């Protein structure tokens, strides 16, 4: 043969190692799963809440998009909102994927390639990787291919946002859902890399209890705070402290998700290049919402920041209090000089002498060393500055007296704290309002910026709560990591059939509408009702700050298995991927669905059969948007707090449109109208009580058997009676058989069904003659995907 070129690519041996055939969608592109996305968007109507009526993204603008007007490029209001939603979701996706890319390079540089081993009780070891890529990772290097895939998709998605590209709102939403899926894979890559490299727990229900709270940090030692989401530099600080035997001189605490991940290091006892059982020596200072309160309290001597969710004025805040700052990641450099190539001695000297307020050090090893040495050396030098930065009693009273009660602060406060009234009470000697609203304050400092008297309100809070700060000492279970296959085998059937009423996932940030106590209240409500409750990130931290009458935090009250009446701390934000993973495992382990490159099939199973609901009750960031959107694509609904209207979009079902609730019965291909289950994909609740009621409802699934539906309906009605004093208005939509009815309300409900809704009932036999949308049928196999039909009539 002449002029023939033969190219041989990678030799694939996957078929010999996997008992599943390759599914239809390995590495899905932007449009590959568009049909599935449209199924979601057609059932759950997109509702937009634009922040304004104009578009200013190109120089033809500003363009007025009110009514039926279009922009100069031809875009309408719906598409303009869809574009902004996509950009926001992409920001979150990029943050997690870039985090994964940094960890990938760092872990390979520090540890070399390592076998990917999640332990003997986890065989479905990277569910999202397998479901999306259609491959199994064998070593850390294999995650490079997944990162390349994520990065390619991100580029294509962002390109669609350019003026003159995508112009239809439904396709923008499909692209947002695709970005959300990429985000979920990016998170899984992050947590799998650090779990293996840093020997973190692999599904440990009995992960150790670690210390949380500002009061846990020993003020007799130098205190280093590691702030952000990437553990690399903070871990090096811990390793340096351990290797130089400095724990008697320094305390290390974390803020935000770095805090959770530092407490997970080397907890399994496996052979590691890192000192054993290092994690519990770190402490969790608190979630992101406590950051400015911590600074005002002066609890730290040095701060090392990495990436994500770091307040942009961190340097200014610390500089005012002579707290050196070290930027350890190129995503946050704060205008600081790059001292990566300078000697550690020279950098420490400049920081301890306050010649520089901070430095950037992009080598995690050097950053960790400098951070520890600086914290120890600067501690005695900061004592006088710390005293000067804190109010005395007289300064507190004098500052209170300057308030004119103009109430401008209350108008800008996100949780609407009546600050002027609080100050007025304090002038009378009553500090209780300062105490009771301390955990409600989100630490945004808008009040300070708007105050015409320039009152430092957060400093007032610090003085009024100084005893609480000293005694803020609680216990939190360290992040356990993924859900075990053995746990899924135990809960799969009762979860799908409804005997376990659902999985409740508390995730996200610290921008709560009414304080951190709501995290605890929501978690306790559902764990007491027998739900499987999982938590990650800031919500996991914030629910730790409360004790019962026996002095136990929620983590001490309940066990940490993935089971009913248990509560699991899965880990940091990136560990949210394991919640996706648990749902995928129900499909593949319990139902024997092939997950390999079979995303829409798995998502269809989850949406139709796995009772689960997420709540991001403090959502503030673009990462929260990408997390929720990724969860939505895999078929799990999410409830968010009222300020989430700023995200601009919800997915709401219309119960008055029967055509939206038609599904296929896979056993015979017949179309069947179902109850609105789940009723929404993204729901904005106004209050904690409304959120809990909606969460219970969003755990309904068409596959519930009569016992399971009865259990779910009981909790739905109980929550409504407990918080609203009446049965929910729509309970009858979820009744298929008399056996579905809660025993406590059965007679009352049957009368209402007959008298109010016109159902015909055989009272003697206790049967419905007519009325329900469909009968309870244990053989009913709902699906939205035609290829799942087993036999057509």
UniProtKB/Swiss-Prot annotation:
Residues noted as binding [4Fe-4S] cluster 4 in the record, renumbered to the chain: 413, 441, 444, 447
Cofactor: [4Fe-4S] cluster; [Ni-4Fe-4S] cluster
The enzyme's E.C. designation: 1.2.7.4
Keywords: 4Fe-4S, Iron, Iron-sulfur, Metal-binding, Nickel, Oxidoreductase, Repeat
Pfam families: Prismane
A single MF term (Gene Ontology): nickel cation binding
Stored InterPro entries: 4Fe4S_Fe-S-bd, 4Fe4S_Fe_S_CS, CdhA, HCP/CODH, Prismane-like_a/b-sand, Prismane-like_sf
Binding site for [4Fe-4S] cluster 2: 55, 58, 63, 73
Domain of life: Archaea
Cofactor binding description: Binds 6 [4Fe-4S] clusters per heterotetramer. Binds 2 [Ni-4Fe-4S] clusters per heterotetramer.
Class of enzymatic activity (EC top level): oxidoreductase
GO biological process terms on file: acetyl-CoA metabolic process; response to hydrogen peroxide
Function (record text): Part of the ACDS complex that catalyzes the reversible cleavage of acetyl-CoA, allowing autotrophic growth from CO(2). The alpha-epsilon subcomponent functions as a carbon monoxide dehydrogenase.
Domain writeup: Cluster B is an all-cysteinyl-liganded 4Fe-4S cluster; cluster C is a mixed Ni-Fe-S cluster which is the active site of CO oxidation. Cluster D is also an all-cysteinyl-liganded 4Fe-4S cluster that bridges the two subunits of the CODH dimer. Contains two additional 4Fe-4S clusters, dubbed E and F, that probably transport electrons from ferredoxin to the B cluster.
Subunit-structure text: Heterotetramer of two alpha and two epsilon subunits. The ACDS complex is made up of alpha, epsilon, beta, gamma and delta subunits with a probable stoichiometry of (alpha(2)epsilon(2))(4)-beta(8)-(gamma(1)delta(1))(8).
NCBIfam families cross-referenced by the UniProt entry: cdhA (TIGR00314)
Family affiliation: Belongs to the Ni-containing carbon monoxide dehydrogenase family.
PANTHER family tied to this protein: ACETYL-COA DECARBONYLASE_SYNTHASE COMPLEX SUBUNIT ALPHA (PTHR30109:SF6), HYDROXYLAMINE REDUCTASE (PTHR30109)
Protein name: Acetyl-CoA decarbonylase/synthase complex subunit alpha
Protein source organism: Methanothrix soehngenii
């Amino acid at each position: 043969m002449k002029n023939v070129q033969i190219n041989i690519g990678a030799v694939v041996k996957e078929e010999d190692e996997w008992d599943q055939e390759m599914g239809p969608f390995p590495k899905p592109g932007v449009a590959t799963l568009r049909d599935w996305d449209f199924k979601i968007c057609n059932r759950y109507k997109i509702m937009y809440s634009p922040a304004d009526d104009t578009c200013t993204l190109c120089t033809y603008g500003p363009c007025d998009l009110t009514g039926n007007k279009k922009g100069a490029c031809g875009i309408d209001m719906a598409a303009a909102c869809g574009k902004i939603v996509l950009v926001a979701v992409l920001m979150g996706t990029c943050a997690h994927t870039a985090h994964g890319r940094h960890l990938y390079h760092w872990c390979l540089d520090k540890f070399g390639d390592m076998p990917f081993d999640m332990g003997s009780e986890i065989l479905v070891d990277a569910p999202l990787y397998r479901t999306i890529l259609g491959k199994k990772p064998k070593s850390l290097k294999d995650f490079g291919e997944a990162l390349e895939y994520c990065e390619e998709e991100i580029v294509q998605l962002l390109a669609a946002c350019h003026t003159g590209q995508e112009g239809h709102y439904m396709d923008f939403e499909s692209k947002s859902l695709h970005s959300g899926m990429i985000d979920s894979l990016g998170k899984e890559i992050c947590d799998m890399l650090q779990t293996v490299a840093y020997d973190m727990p692999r599904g440990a229900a009995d992960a150790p209890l670690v210390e949380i709270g500002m009061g846990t940090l020993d003020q007799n030692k130098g205190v280093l705070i590691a702030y952000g989401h990437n553990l690399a530099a903070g871990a090096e600080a811990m390793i340096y402290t351990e290797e130089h035997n400095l724990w008697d001189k320094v305390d290390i605490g974390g803020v935000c998700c770095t805090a959770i991940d530092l407490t997970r290091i080397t907890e399994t006892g496996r052979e590691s290049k890192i000192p054993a059982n290092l994690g519990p020596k770190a402490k969790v200072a608190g979630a992101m919402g406590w950051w400015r309160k911590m600074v005002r309290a002066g609890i730290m001597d040095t701060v090392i920041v990495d990436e994500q969710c770091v307040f942009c004025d961190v340097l200014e805040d610390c500089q005012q209090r002579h707290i050196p700052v070290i930027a350890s990641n190129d995503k946050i450099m704060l205008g600081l000089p790059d001292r990566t190539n300078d000697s550690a001695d020279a950098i420490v000297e400049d920081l301890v002498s306050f010649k520089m307020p901070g430095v950037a050090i992009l080598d995690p090893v050097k950053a960790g060393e400098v951070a520890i040495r600086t914290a120890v050396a600067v501690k005695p030098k900061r004592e006088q500055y710390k005293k000067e930065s804190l109010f005395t009693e007289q300064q507190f009273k004098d500052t209170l007296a300057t308030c004119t009660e103009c109430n401008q602060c209350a108008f800008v406060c996100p949780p609407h704290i009546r600050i002027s009234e609080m100050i007025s009470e304090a002038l009378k000697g009553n500090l209780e309002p300062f105490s009771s609203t301390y955990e409600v304050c989100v630490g945004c400092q808008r009040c300070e910026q708007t105050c015409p008297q320039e009152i430092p309100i957060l400093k007032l809070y610090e003085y009024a709560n100084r005893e609480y700060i000293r005694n803020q000492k609680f216990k939190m279970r360290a992040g356990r990591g993924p859900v075990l296959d053995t746990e899924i085998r135990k809960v799969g059937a009762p979860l799908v059939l409804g005997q376990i009423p659902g999985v409740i996932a508390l995730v996200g940030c610290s921008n709560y509408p009414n304080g951190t106590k709501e995290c605890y209240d929501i978690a306790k409500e559902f764990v007491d009702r027998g739900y499987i409750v999982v938590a990650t990130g800031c919500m996991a931290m914030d629910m730790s700050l409360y004790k019962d009458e026996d002095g136990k935090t929620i983590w001490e009250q309940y066990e940490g298995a993935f089971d009913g009446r248990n509560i699991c701390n899965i880990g940091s934000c990136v560990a949210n991927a394991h919640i996706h993973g648990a749902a995928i495992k129900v499909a593949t382990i319990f139902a024997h669905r092939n997950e390999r490159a079979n995303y829409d099939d798995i998502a269809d199973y989850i949406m139709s059969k796995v009772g689960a609901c997420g709540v991001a009750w403090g959502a503030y960031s673009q990462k929260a948007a990408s997390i929720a959107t990724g969860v939505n694509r895999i078929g799990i609904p999410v409830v968010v707090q009222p300020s989430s209207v700023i995200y601009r979009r919800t997915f709401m079902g219309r119960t008055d449109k029967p055509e939206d609730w038609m599904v296929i019965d896979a056993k015979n291909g017949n179309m069947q109208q179902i109850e609105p289950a789940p009723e929404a994909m993204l729901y904005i609740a106004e209050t904690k009580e409304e959120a809990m009621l909606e969460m219970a409802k969003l755990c309904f699934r068409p596959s519930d058997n009569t016992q399971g539906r009865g259990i779910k309906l009981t909790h739905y009605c109980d929550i409504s009676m407990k918080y609203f004093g009446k049965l929910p208005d729509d309970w009858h939509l979820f009744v298929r058989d008399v056996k579905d009815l809660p025993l406590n309300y059965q007679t009352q409900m049957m009368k209402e069904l007959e008298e109010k809704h016109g159902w015909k009932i055989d009272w003697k036999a206790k049967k419905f003659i007519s009325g329900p949308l469909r009968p309870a049928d244990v053989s009913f196999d709902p699906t939205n995907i035609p290829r799942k039909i087993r036999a057509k009539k």
